[in-house]
């Protein structure tokens, strides 16, 4: 009973939050659009972003709108806004997004939005995730006659894009620009505005570009100066869906903010090294992928089958990979956007404070997340090569595969990208293999000694699983067969003396003799020599 009362109260609060009558809604809209500090582009933003330590991504935005701080001033591109711009309003568009749950992939992670409630736009609404408003909304208003004709525009005020354009609404609606949601990547509310115009004397033309939508020019061109009669607001938050769309467009890669949020709210318990890193320094996303070779065979009395594919790390999830996949070095990429590539950077920054992309160099280190042992180190990687997933840096510590010591266990590793202030060409190279010097490597000390800044990171849990056991036992068995052949001994199948010990970790009784077999279609990663030996033996 108490639960029912609570639900009714929550429903009442939600309904009360939505303005009910047109006159009240219009007056509230006029107040909100004139507020100079309500949204991320407000007066406070220019103060926060004008100092030398401001982060370029968080301070990004269309530079042509940098001096406009309220919704109305950005819409009409005037520094001094007057209420006369909205003198003809008599319509408050009711905008409703129907529930649309679904899956999507962003920042190399799978997300699911299962919210089943509809979204009703309102000037005082709680910000809603872009994924929930990704489909064209229903638009109506009090007194709408279906034989009337209006022009409807939806524009993203923060990013100066046109997101929807329809003419002759609702009598004979013709859509000139299909609906798209906001791509708000920043963790601050961002407004979209729904504008309703009476049909003017000039025919409405489709926009030539979605970006830098200039409302005053649009109104002048189509003779709509006195025909703006309706205005409503849609307030959006950010989500991985919007972040990924910006990323795919090559504008801004803000995936790292999701990782920072995850590490802050739920830090990994056993990542001793990670706890000592300045996570707030991270300014980019690190994509890491391993090549997984095809495997088809039997080991520990079990069948294993892996396809040939690329395995991307997912630091936003708790995903493990087979140690077999880590036998060869990974591919690394990190999108770096210069001021010449995107208008979003340098929004409030001075050019003298911006480090030119062509001069940026980075170091990449892979370390044991528990003990700090160094598994790989490359320095002097050009930023342009990171964009192309082509390291081409100077190798100072050869790659050592990420292999746990015991069967049926997993171990965590960190991939760390560090921004260099200068070349590190003279850095002395490390020894080969997991030698004592590598075991004494300390990332924090290395970072401090060379004045490095943490730019990006990723994590992975590598597991000594059955596919890796297959690799180890097959390698051992082939060596045994070679020695037996030299001693004129023959066996009908491959068998490793290590099988009992290794397979016991996978709950196989030591009394079971489990031969190791390999499909003729398996692409082995043990090496060309091993393949030749097997072919000769069989």
Curated annotation (Swiss-Prot):
<feature type="glycosylation site" description="N-linked (GlcNAc...) asparagine">
    <location>
        <position position="115"/>
    </location>
</feature>
<dbReference type="InterPro" id="IPR036610">
    <property type="entry name" value="PEBP-like_sf"/>
</dbReference>
<feature type="signal peptide">
    <location>
        <begin position="1"/>
        <end position="17"/>
    </location>
</feature>
<keyword id="KW-0732">Signal</keyword>
<keyword id="KW-0325">Glycoprotein</keyword>
<protein>
    <recommendedName>
        <fullName>Uncharacterized protein C56G2.4</fullName>
    </recommendedName>
</protein>
